[in-house]
Design a protein with these regions (language model features):
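Structured catalytic-domain cores with a bias toward divalent-metal coordination
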Residues: 1-457
């Protein structure tokens, strides 16, 4: 068993003080801040990442508390590894307590193009390379890796789980009583969890644990880590009943924090990117508020009211002290019936359905080494809508807000769009990859891995 004891000693020990963000005196100087492992540590590894944004240290504080408990109790039921990694160390160590990042948002640059750039391109490019190297090394040494990226929010909102919607990720996340938000990766490029999922083939989820400076966010994140250890099969939670950390069961902590939102599922429908640093969320706009399409003012930017092109609920309204052009202004989400997920899981496993989809008029396979990507005529895509692609397990890589209508109008538009594509005939050689008339969709990577694994059994 091992951990970085020198870092642990920098945390105050009294229960009251441990709940306070302001009492943490540690300087985050190491990429790997600690680990706890059993003798058979080549099994499952749970990686906890905290501080990807400098003003969000709660996840790291919670992770160090978990390591403290594990080292104090040395539970015999522990099989595997828990590894804690720091995210944006310079931003975490900044004298500006509101510093989210130094040059670039670290959680937006894990793309192929940015990874290919020199480490000295920016502070965050160097941090990205170090963090990615650590994750690759851990994955190479583990039979199975699961990553939990812990964050907090600028607005007052209940804890939530966010991940790419694969069946494997669902099975892991739904063992925790958190509301689930799907489709983030379709609106944001360069997420840490997106790189982990699609390069390293591992389940990866983001957990937003509460508001930045709320001490309860530490308690929530600690409960999330214990629940993650249990869900991954590394440590049955019953092994720690009676310890000071488990006077309240982790699941009960999370249920209390989320209230009636437990296990509810939402789909992200729109992201507004800030275009001017004079951006303010309107009074009364809070996470979860219902808004009307093109009606409800959500923010004021450079003197102009901002409304949403879609209806739904507000998610993650930006209340940061400092805002930069390109930052997330807000998201709009809609609730999904839980029965939809079960139906979706059954459909995704039917390979004949995917073969039919690929041969529909206006749909073209993309030669991408078996990743299951398709070009889809935007008129047809607008009729099918993103929720239908999600149902069959496709992620939107390139899309727009084109809407094929509702009810009878949608049925008519669908019929005419398919007829046009049918009589037009296939495009020789397929569409140009930059043709905006076509959406690009791709099957979820972990669903394809799961299919291959099942076929090999």
């Amino acid at each position: 068993m091992s951990t970085n004891d020198d870092l642990k000693t920098k945390f105050v020990r009294s229960v009251d003080d441990r709940n306070s963000l302001s009492n943490v005196g540690a300087r985050w100087t190491k990429r790997e801040l600690g680990r706890f492992e059993s003798d058979d540590h080549r099994g499952t590894t749970l990686v906890v990442i905290g501080g990807v944004h400098g003003n969000e240290p709660a996840g790291l504080i919670a992770a160090m508390r978990v390591l403290d408990t594990l080292n104090a109790e040395e539970p015999t039921g522990f099989h595997g590894q828990l590894v804690v990694l720091g995210g944006n160390l310079p931003a975490l160590n900044s004298d500006d307590e509101n510093a989210r990042y130094i040059d670039f948002d670290l959680n937006r640059i894990f793309t192929d193009e940015q990874i290919a750039m020199p480490e000295d391109t920016s502070v965050e490019h160097g941090q990205m390379q170090e963090l990615l190297a650590a994750l690759r090394s851990i994955r190479a040494q583990s039979e199975r890796m699961i990553v939990m990226d812990l964050h907090t929010t600028s607005s007052d909102a209940p804890p939530v789980a966010v991940f790419e919607d694969s069946i494997m990720a669902r099975e892991f996340a739904r063992q925790m009583p958190l509301p689930i938000y799907l489709g983030f990766e379709e609106e944001l490029d360069g997420l840490v969890i997106d790189r982990v999922t699609n390069e390293l083939g591992s389940v990866a989820i983001v957990v937003e644990g509460g508001q930045h400076n709320d001490p309860q966010s530490i308690v929530v994140h600690e409960a999330v880590i214990w629940a993650g250890l249990h869900a991954s099969g590394i440590l049955p939670i019953g092994s720690l009943i009676g310890s000071f950390a488990h006077e309240t069961m982790p699941g009960d902590v999370l249920r209390k924090a989320v209230g009636d939102q437990a296990y509810k599922v939402f789909d992200i429908r729109h992201r507004y990117a800030i275009e001017h640093d004079d951006f303010v969320i309107c009074p009364g706009i809070v996470a979860g508020k219902k808004i009307k399409q093109e009606v409800t003012p959500i923010a004021v930017e450079n003197g102009q009211e901002i409304v949403s092109p879609v209806r739904g609920r507000v998610f993650l309204p930006n209340m940061q002290e400092t805002k930069r052009v390109g930052d997330d202004g807000f998201f709009i989400v809609r609730h999904i019936d839980e029965g939809w997920l079960g139906f979706s899981a059954r459909l995704r496993k039917q390979e004949w359905i995917h073969r039919i989809i690929a041969h529909l008029p206006g749909v073209y396979r993309i030669d991408d080494a078996g990743h299951g990507s398709l070009y889809v005529d935007r008129d047809i895509a607008g009729v099918l809508k993103r929720q239908v692609f999600h149902l069959f397990g496709y992620r939107l890589i390139r899309h727009d807000q084109h809407d094929g209508g509702h009810g009878v109008v949608r049925a008519w538009n669908g019929m005419t769009s398919f007829c046009k594509a049918f009589f037009r005939g296939p495009i020789p050689g397929g569409p140009d990859e930059n043709d905006p008339r076509f959406w690009i969709v791709r099957r979820h990577h972990l669903d394809r891995i799961d299919r291959i694994d099942r076929a090999d059994r």
